[in-house]
Structure formats: C-alpha cells, structure tokens
Amino acid sequence: MKLGWLEAAALTAASVASAQVKQDDLPVSPPYYPSPWSNGEGEWAEAYNRAVQIVSQMTLDEKVNLTTGTGMSEKCVGQTGSVPRLGINSICLQDGPLGIRFTDYNSAFPAGVNVAATWDRQLAYIRGHAMGQEFSDKGIDVQLGPAAGPLGRFPDGGRNWEGFSPDPVLSGVLFAETIKGIQDAGVIATAKHYLLNEQEHFRQVPEANGYGYNITETLSENVDDKTLHELYLWPFADAVRAGVGAIMCSYQHLNNTQACQNSHLLNKLLKAELGFQGFVMSDWSATHSGVGSALAGMDMTMPGDIAFNDGLSYYGPNLTISVLNGTVPQWRVDDMAVRVMAAFYKVGRDRLATPPNFSSWTRAEKGYEHASIDGGAYGTVNEFVDVQQDHASLIRRVGADSIVLLKNEGSLPLTGKERNVAILGEDAGSNPYGANGCDDRGCAQGTLAMGWGSGTANFPYLVTPEQAIQQEVLKGRGNVFAVTDNWALDKVNKTASESTVSLVFVNAGAGEGFISVDGNEGDRKNLTLWKNGENLIKAAASNCNNTIVVIHSVGAVLVDQFYEHPNVTAILWAGLPGQESGNSLVDVLYGRVNPNGKSPFTWGKTREAYGAPLLTEANNGNGAPQTDHTEGVFIDYRHFDRTNQTPIYEFGHGLSYTTFKYSNLTVQKLNAPAYSPASGQTKAAPTFGTIGEAEDYVFPDSITRVREFIYPWINSTDLKESSGDPNYGWDDEDYIPEGAKDGSPQDVLPSGGGAGGNPRLYDDLFRITAIIKNTGPVAGTEVPQLYVSLGGPNEPKVVLRGFDKLVIQPGEERVFTTTLTRRDLSNWDMEKDDWVITSYPKKVFVGSSSRKLPLRASLPAVQ
C-alpha cells in the first residue's frame, strides 16, 4: 500500500515543467501570477469573515482536506475530506444541471435548453430553487450545475442541451437566475464548464483512445481575448455577479494550456478581472498537475484521485508536502480553504447541512460504507427520502412554456373533438426497458425527455406523449391509434389515412462523450432526425392532410425535407421536457397553454449553413488536437446574418395562438458616471494560522487506512521519500512561474474592481420602451426582444441585449421596458485590455425575433 502512495508524484517539478512546454507554432496562453486571494468584497463579506475565522483554527492537513476529494468510493460522486475537530463534515458534491443523478424519489426537470426556450427569468429562478431544495433534502452540499459551457459554438455539440443558448446574453441571464434559485435554497451552485467545453470529441484522452483516436493530450480551443470576453466569458461574468459559490474548470486546453492549470483563465480572467470569491474545482479527472494547478488558481481537485479508484492524488498528501517545503506558499492553501468555506457559509449550508441519505452506487437499502471496495461498515446507505414536493406541476409548466410553435397553418389548437387521432413514431411511446432502463439515459429508445451522460437524473416516472394524448382523446370520446415503430411505414400509411389528425413524433439525441449511441460519440454525427424520422413524417403527410410534427431534440435538426409539405400543418419543438413530457405537450396542443416559447437557437437549411464542423479527426499528431475559433463571435444567428443566409426558423422565433403588434419605440439617455478603469492595489496575501513541521502530518497510527481513499497525511518526515518524486529538490526558478509565489499587494486590473468586472460596466446608460398590443382573440404571452448594432465593420449585424415576457389580454397594450448597460454597448479592446465603447454609430431594434424587428432607433453617442 505504501508503494502506491509513494508513486503519487503529482506535485513534482517535472509535471509543472512539462505543462509549460508547448510547440512554438501553436497558440499559447499567457501566464498570469500570482493567484488572486479572496477579499470578501460586497455580499461575500460576512461569509468571508466566518471562513477566515474557521480556517484560522485549522491545521495544514485540515485545510488540505477541504481542497481534495476522497475518491469515488463514498456516497456522493464527489466528497471532500472532513474537519471533525471543528465540526465540519465532508462536503458532498453531486450531479447535475437538471436534477439529482444516481438517486431515487427525485424529480427529473426540463433541460437547460428548455429553460432558454421559455425566455423567462422568473421561471429559471423557480426551477433553480426547486432543484436546490431537492439537492439539500438529499444531503447534498454542492449541485454540479448549471452549465453555460458549452455555450453552443456548434449546433451538433453533445452537451449543448445542458446549457441554455448560443447567445451569451440569453444564457447569462438564465444562468444567473438559476444560480440564485439554487443558492437561495441553501445549496452551492457550480457554474460549469469553465471554459470552452464546446465539443465532446477529444475532451479526455482515455475516452478518445477508447474510440480509436491516438492522442496523448486533450483538445486545445484556440481563441482570442475579444472572442472570450464578448462570447464565452460573458455568462460566467453574470454568474459571478449572481454570487455563484463554485466554478468547475473544464477538460479542454485553452490555447494549449489545460483549463484547470491555466493561469490566464483562472487567475486573470476569473479571479482578478471578474472578482470571483468562491472556489474553482476541477471537472472529474481534469486535474493534470498539482503545483501547476494550485498556483494557477484551482482550489479543489475532484474526485480527488488521478484515475478513478487508484488511490493517488495530485493534491492530498502531495499538496501537504508542497506547502511544507515552500513550493506552494501558505497563503495559497489558506486562500483555497477560505474560498471553500466562504461559499459554504454564503448559502447558509452550515444551517442546513445533513449527511447524504443516499448512495450513488446502489439502489439497495443496505451496503458498504466504501462502495468501490466493499469495505468499511455495512449498514443503511439509502434512506429513500422523497424530495419531490409538488415540483411536478412546475416541471409541467416549464415544459409547456418551453414548447416552440415553429409552424401553424390553423390546425392548432386541437378542439378535443377530433374523431380519429393517429399517434405515430417511437418518440411518442415508452422505452421498452423502462424510463431509466439505460444507464445515464444512454440509449435511443422511446420518447426523448433528456440527453445522456452525467447531466441526467433518474426519472421518478415519465408521462409519454402517447399516454397523455390518449387521455385527451378519450375525454372527447374519439378514437386513438398508435404506431410506435418508425420503420413500419405500411402501418403508418394505413393509420394516417384513416385519421382526421396525425401527430408524428420524431427526435434526435446527444450527450456526454463517455457514451456513444448509434455512432454519436457524445456529439451528434449529423443534424438529421433519428430512426427514419424524415421518412416517417413524409409517409404520414402523404396520407393525412392534417399532419402535426412534434420534435423532441437536444437542439436544431434539419427540417428541410418536410417543413413546406402542404399537409404538414404544424411543427412544434418540445426539446427535452423531463418527467411531465406528455402532460406539458397536451397543455399546448389543446390550447390550455398558449404557446409562448421562442427558439433559443437558429434552424438552418443545412449543417454547412452553420459554418465549420466540429473537430472529429486528430490534427496534431498524437498531441493535443487543435480547433481554432476563426469565426470569432460569429456563431448561430450572428453567423447567418454575417453570411446573408435566410434560416428556416430564426433565433427568437416562436408563434402563438394570437397575434401581437409592436409600436412606439422610445430611447431615453440616462445620467451615468463616466467610465474609469479600475486602479490601485490589493492588500497583501493574508495567512491564517501556522503550518507546523513535517512530523505533525505523518499518517496517524490511530487511523486505519482505507484502500483507494485519499488522505492529506504524508508517509514520512522525509519529504522527498514521502513524495516518491525522482525530481524532488529542483530549484523554484527551474519550474515555478515568475511571480507565482508573490504574496505582496498586486495591481488591480483596469477591467476589474468588482463582481463581474469593473462596476461601471453595469451602469444603465439608456432606457428603452416599446408598446406591444395583443391584436388577436385570446390571451397570450409575448417575448419582446431588444437587439443592438454596435456599428463596427467587423461586428455582428445585431446582438441580443434584452428581453422580457409579457402576458397580454386580447386588445390590451403592455409596455416593454428595459435598459442598456455600458457592457451592452462595449467591445473588448485587446490592446487596452479593457472594455471600450467605440465611436461607431449604434442602433437599437425591438421585435419578436432576430429577423422580425419592426422598431428601430439610433442611440445618442456615449463615452
């Protein structure tokens, strides 16, 4: 056993040095050191002070315990060590962004992409709060969600559905509201994946090797700082302003440095510029060095071990050694511990925390304390605590409000008096193996209600479209017949020909890269419908002149083969609606809910219409595959506008059972202070308590070592022997980046100075109003959208900058009011390393989508 610990040379000079070696012709990520220390500014003050008080009482091994997962053998997918002397239990971290993974008696909420389709701030908050309640009641301290990485660079990116939208403003608003909801329920939210987790191919070396790709390093996302700030970083700035407690760094490289040891990404952008006060954790097995990651700003390694269940760690005892020998300064490990505890106190977790009442690894009531080794005490591991409350009604509401009515030729809403209703397509029915019959939902059976991977939850039940529609039809004493075999086209033809309305269900899934479904290695291999979907629709439409298509998908699909068919009278996108799938759908089909979803992405005519494909072939030998963001900020609707392409359905599009008229646009300039770059210096890095000597941290004789469990203690007072590192003793100058250990006061970045960046960025410069009138016969909900032209020759034609959701009665007028901040009107200047408002003339547009903008006005110049 001791040999295994000695082999954990995780914080070695060699590992840090090798992380700095890059080929000369590849993009590089500039270094930024030291790692900024938290200061408890703003709403973090009380939590920070409490964290400082408790960390000041900790010994080094106790601080290290807070930074290191104990491996994959405990109840949660991630658990830190504990500090029992001070009454601090291990911190439980659990997936995922749409509900609790690996448990029971929990809810399966609609996916993030569905929340984006609601364009509803309040609903995003309520959903977040409901999820937070469930996590808290299961004894979970940290929810591993929500996600805004991936943002959605590619329409076929595997995990886009976990996030919200490829538009940074829409994503940022809903990201922030979800975080607020989770944390107001007393659980730490995790903003992930930071940053550029835009595709599944090549995100992990073992995973890629398993698919036959010969690589030794993960994908490098090569991107300039303008694109980072104006697109991918934008939602994370909103998350920081929302007070998010944790941020998860991603598997990918940014400009050829691993995200979890990328000082530009973590130290500069996140902590120095955005003023993040919480802690940075690694994605699972995304830690590739110890000293390198610690000095670059990563505060917690998860799940703690290097490879699952190997008992070795880049932190743990190696972090203890590195602090004892001065490789990692005391102030840095103190800051790591303070950040963890500050997040814990900020959400009030100390008042709510209870031990986990479930096991991630078995549904049995009884089991071993340490599941992976069948070791430790044997007893109750699952208490089967029902945490669902009344969340089913909320899930149904989100599902209904997220349905986007793409096309309607008058066939909807249904009356309930249809005599013969055909339900066609496998996507209408049940998975023959059960709703949870495939691990992490990794299959293509039955109706699609979530994607696959770690971002899933177990269904407590799943109401299928077939079940819900049949109930509706029978209420009206009609006939209903279902064919749920997509390949039985002869049966489809016959059933459709005998129906007064044919409801055709099709889908397309995607998910995390560790699962491949029908050759889709996480990412989709194309944008077509699955399982003969196009032919299914055409067969039905050829035999029924009232064919309604319902699409359950992770994002855009190609509809070019059927959207103009004269017998396809309506098309609805229902996304990934969660457990109430069928019920939320019938609410819209039968008019109980007037459809009010708006598409959070663009529907192109071909895959090529979206621009470059995601990378599926290694292009750098066996080194890190390289993907260059040559498109800059031009993704989704920005790309379509730039290339003068007309999409089938544009970003923001969504029909209603009523109509709306826009008028009376007004622009009011507000009094706001002039922009001034932040200046001054931070205080010196504080230290809390003392470190002691090596003999204080030798593995205690009183502790029985558990195989695979990660401890903070060392094996010997001889630090070189304890490290097992053949390169132990290198001089700092040989491998420690310049300034990385400097705890003296540091200059404040011009773009920094507050949560989310320079506080002046968030000053309101203009108030925009418009009148929206319901000109139809029924009450409806409209989403007015504000777009801005920033005016520059190399800028997008328009960018979304505001929206609202208004319930409007027939004949009623409502006023849409929003503001434009300095950030909304700024561009990132890479020379000044700051935001600037250019001198180009700027315009505002208001309408119902990115292509339907009837109102426009020029903005007065602003400094």
Curated annotation (Swiss-Prot):
Residues modified by glycosylation = N65, N214, N255, N318, N325, N357, N493, N526, N545, N567, N664, N715
| Enzyme Commission numbers on file | 3.2.1.21
A Pfam family assignment:
Glyco_hydro_3_C
Where primarily located?
A: secreted
Keywords for this entry? Carbohydrate metabolism, Cellulose degradation, Glycoprotein, Glycosidase, Hydrolase, Polysaccharide degradation, Secreted, Signal
As for subcellular location, the record says: Secreted
- Fetch the InterPro entries from UniProt: Cellulose_deg_GH3 (IPR050288), Fn3-like (IPR026891), Glyco_hydro_3_AS (IPR019800), Glyco_hydro_3_C (IPR002772), Glyco_hydro_3_C_sf (IPR036881), Glyco_hydro_3_N (IPR001764), Glyco_hydro_3_N_sf (IPR036962), Glycoside_hydrolase_SF (IPR017853)
Which chemical reaction does it catalyze?
Answer: Hydrolysis of terminal, non-reducing beta-D-glucosyl residues with release of beta-D-glucose
- Supply one GO CC term from the record: extracellular region
Q: Name one GO biological process term.
A: cellulose catabolic process
Q: Pathway it acts in?
A: Glycan metabolism; cellulose degradation
Q: Where is this region: Disordered?
A: 720-754
GO molecular function of the protein, one example? beta-glucosidase activity
**Residue span of the signal peptide, if any?**
1-19
- Residues at the active site: D283
- Annotated function: Beta-glucosidases are one of a number of cellulolytic enzymes involved in the degradation of cellulosic biomass. Catalyzes the last step releasing glucose from the inhibitory cellobiose.
Under PANTHER family, the record lists: BETA-GLUCOSIDASE, BETA-GLUCOSIDASE A-RELATED
What family classification does the UniProt entry report for this protein? Answer: Belongs to the glycosyl hydrolase 3 family.
Protein name stated in the entry: Probable beta-glucosidase A
Q: Which organism is it from?
A: Emericella nidulans (strain FGSC A4 / ATCC 38163 / CBS 112.46 / NRRL 194 / M139) (Aspergillus nidulans)
